[in-house]
C-alpha cells in the first residue's frame, strides 16, 4: 500500500495564536464552572460561631443561591445527580455507623385550629434534642431529613458522665447542607467527635402537614355532628419519620423518646405513652396553646413514633389493670359503632400475654379510627391507628363473618405489639418476621374466638393456595432477601406485599405444623424474651427453633 497524500486546512500563524488563546480561555471557564459544580444544597451558619441557620435560602458548595420554595411547592433543591456531588457517605442509602442514638426529646407543634380547618399551607414546627454516642471519630454527621427547613442547629458535648444533659463543651457547626436524593441532612463540624463520648444534637425545624398524601404528619378533613372537622395524625412506617423530624430513621437504631405535643386547647393529643402533664404556652400573636407531655417510651425505632391531635370522642375499657381507649367520630361513638372493637381488644391482648407468658409492656393502649387512612391499619406502640371502615360495626349487626373480620384486623395489629414492637427486624429485608407472624396469629385468634368460622379452610384456600399460585410466577421472591436489594424507600415499600404477609404466614403455619404447636410457641417465647427491646434477623429465629428441637430430640432418643 502506498503512503496516502496529506490533506487538511492551513491557517496563518496569527490565526493559530488566536485559536490557542481562545482555547486557553475556554479551559479556564470550564475549570471555574467545575469549581461551582456542587453536590447538594447547604446552609451556612454565621461567621461568629453562632449555630443559627438561615432558613431563607439553600446554598450549594460554590455559593450559588436558590430561593426556598413556598410551603405548598416542591423544593427546587438540585438533586445529587444534577449537581454532581463529591464522593462521600451521603452517596449511600444507609447511615454510616458513626453515631448511635440513645434518646430523643421531641417537641412538635402542628398549627391546627378549629376555626382554620383548611388553610392553604398547614405547617408544623418542632424541636428535637438527640442524645447520641460517638463510635467513630468524625467531623461530619449524617441524619435522615426530608423536606424539613432548619432554623437552628447545635451540637453540645461531650456530655458529662452519668448524666444526660450536663455538658462540658460545645462543638462548632460550620456548615449544614442537604443530600436530598438520599434524604440526609449533613453537619460539617469544626472538630471531630470523640469515640466513646456522648453528645446532644439540637435542631429547630419546620415542615408541612400533608393534605394530600397520608404519610409523615398528615391532615384528615371530615364531617361529624353535621360540622366540618379536622385532625392531624402520623404514619411513619417505613421511612417517613424523617419527614417529621431529623432522626436516625433505621429500624435497628432504637432509642427512648420523650414526646411533647403543642396543640389547640380544643383538641386532645395522643401519643405512644400516657399523658404526663399539661401546661400552657402563648404564641407571638397572644393565642393560647396547650402543651401536653408524655411519659418516656421504651426503646423503639423511629417508625413507631406516633401522635394524633383531634377532637374525636372515645370509650374506655380496662383489661388486667390497663386502660384501652377507642377513639372515633362523636356520632359513631354515640351510636355504639365502636363497642365491639372496644370489647374485643382487651381479650386479644390477654390471649397473647398468656400464650407467650410475656406481658404487654406499655401501661395503656389507644386505638384511633381515622376517617381516612390509606395504610389501613398501623401498629404504633401504644397508639394503634385504623381506617374507621375496619372497625365500625352496627350493634344490631349479628353477622359472625363481619365480627370475625374486625377481630382479625385488630388481632393483626395487636400481634405486632410483640412481633415488630417488642422485637424488631434489623432491616426491612426481614419484614416478614413482623408481618408473617402477625398474620399467622390473626388466624389463631380468630379461630379461638370464633371456632365455628372455618378459618383453617379459609386460610388453606385463600392464603396457602393463593401464594402457591403466585410462587410459580416469574416475579416471585423469597420472604427474606439480601439487605442491599432493599435500601431505597420505594424498594422498601414494595416489600409490603403478599409474599411478606401471606407467604410469611404460611411459613409460620408450616413451622407450627411440623414442630408441633407446643415446641413452636416455646421457640417463639425464647426468641421474644432474648430480643426484647432489640432487633433480630431471620437466622436468630432459626437458632431459637433449633434450641427447642435439640432437647426434644434427645428426649425422644432416651425414651
UniProtKB/Swiss-Prot annotation:
Inhibited by bestatin. This is Aminopeptidase Q. Substrate binds at residues 237, 376-380. Disulfide bonds: none annotated. It is a single-pass type II membrane protein. It comes from Mus musculus (Mouse). Residues 1-13 are cytoplasmic. The chain crosses the membrane at residues 14-34. Residues 35-559 are lumenal. The lineage of its organism: Eukaryota, Metazoa, Chordata, Craniata, Vertebrata. It is an enzyme of class 3 (hydrolase).
Amino acid at each position: 500500500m502506498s503512503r496516502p497524500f496529506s490533506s487538511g486546512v492551513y491557517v496563518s500563524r496569527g490565526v493559530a495564536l488566536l485559536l490557542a488563546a481562545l482555547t486557553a480561555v475556554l479551559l479556564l471557564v470550564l475549570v471555574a464552572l467545575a469549581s461551582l459544580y456542587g453536590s447538594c444544597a447547604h446552609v451556612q451558619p454565621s461567621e461568629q460561631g453562632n449555630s443559627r441557620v438561615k432558613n431563607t435560602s439553600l446554598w450549594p458548595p460554590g455559593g450559588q443561591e436558590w430561593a426556598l420554595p413556598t410551603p405548598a411547592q416542591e423544593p427546587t433543591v438540585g438533586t445529587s445527580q444534577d449537581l454532581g456531588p463529591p464522593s462521600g457517605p451521603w452517596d449511600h442509602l444507609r447511615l454510616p455507623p458513626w453515631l448511635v442514638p440513645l434518646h430523643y426529646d421531641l417537641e412538635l407543634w402542628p398549627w391546627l385550629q378549629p376555626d382554620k380547618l383548611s388553610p392553604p399551607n398547614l405547617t408544623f414546627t418542632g424541636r428535637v434534642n438527640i442524645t447520641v454516642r460517638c463510635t467513630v471519630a468524625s467531623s461530619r454527621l449524617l441524619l435522615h431529613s426530608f423536606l424539613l427547613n432548619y432554623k437552628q442547629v447545635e451540637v453540645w458535648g461531650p456530655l458529662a458522665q452519668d448524666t444526660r444533659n450536663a455538658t462540658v463543651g460545645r462543638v462548632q457547626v460550620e456548615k449544614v447542607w442537604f443530600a436530598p436524593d438520599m434524604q440526609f441532612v449533613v453537619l460539617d463540624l469544626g472538630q471531630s467527635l470523640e469515640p466513646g463520648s456522648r453528645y446532644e444534637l439540637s435542631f429547630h425545624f419546620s415542615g408541612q402537614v400533608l393534605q394530600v398524601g397520608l404519610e409523615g404528619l398528615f391532615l384528615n378533613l371530615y364531617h361529624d355532628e353535621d360540622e366540618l372537622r379536622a385532625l392531624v395524625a402520623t404514619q411513619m412506617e417505613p421511612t417517613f419519620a424523617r419527614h417529621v423530624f431529623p432522626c436516625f430513621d433505621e429500624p435497628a437504631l432504637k432509642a427512648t423518646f420523650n414526646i411533647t405535643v403543642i396543640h389547640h386547647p380544643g383538641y386532645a393529643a395522643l401519643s405512644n405513652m400516657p399523658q404526663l402533664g399539661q401546661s400552657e404556652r402563648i404564641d407571638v400573636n397572644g393565642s393560647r396553646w396547650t402543651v401536653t407531655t408524655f411519659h418516656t417510651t421504651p426503646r423503639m425505632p423511629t417508625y413507631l413514633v406516633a401522635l394524633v391531635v383531634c377532637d374525636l370522642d372515645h370509650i374506655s375499657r380496662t383489661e388486667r389493670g390497663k386502660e384501652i381507649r377507642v377513639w372515633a367520630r362523636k356520632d359513631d361513638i354515640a351510636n355504639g359503632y365502636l363497642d365491639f372493637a372496644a370489647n374485643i381488644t382487651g381479650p386479644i391482648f390477654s390471649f397473647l400475654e398468656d400464650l407467650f407468658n410475656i406481658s404487654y409492656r406499655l401501661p395503656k393502649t389507644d386505638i384511633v379510627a381515622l376517617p381516612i387512612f390509606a395504610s389501613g391499619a398501623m401498629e404504633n406502640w401504644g397508639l394503634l391507628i385504623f381506617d374507621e371502615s375496619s372497625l365500625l360495626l352496627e350493634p344490631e349487626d349479628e353477622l359472625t363473618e363481619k365480627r370475625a373480620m374486625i377481630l382479625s384486623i385488630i388481632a393483626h395489629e395487636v400481634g405486632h405489639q410483640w412481633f415488630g414492637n417488642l422485637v424488631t427486624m434489623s432491616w426491612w429485608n426481614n419484614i416478614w418476621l413482623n408481618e408473617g407472624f402477625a398474620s399467622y396469629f390473626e388466624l389463631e385468634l380468630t379461630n379461638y374466638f370464633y371456632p365455628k368460622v372455618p378459618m383453617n379452610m379459609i386460610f388453606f384456600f385463600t392464603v396457602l393456595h393463593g401464594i402457591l399460585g403466585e410462587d410459580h410466577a416469574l416475579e416471585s421472591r423469597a420472604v427474606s432477601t439480601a439487605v442491599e436489594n432493599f435500601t431505597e424507600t420505594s424498594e422498601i415499600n414494595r416489600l409490603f406485599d403478599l409474599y411478606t404477609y401471606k407467604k410469611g404466614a404460611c411459613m409460620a403455619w408450616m413451622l407450627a405444623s411440623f414442630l408441633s404447636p407446643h415446641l413452636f410457641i416455646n421457640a417463639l417465647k425464647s426468641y421474644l424474651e432474648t430480643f426484647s427491646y432489640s432487633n433480630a434477623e431471620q437466622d436468630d429465629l432459626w437458632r431459637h427453633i433449633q434450641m427447642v428441637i435439640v432437647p426434644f430430640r434427645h428426649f425422644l432418643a432416651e425414651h
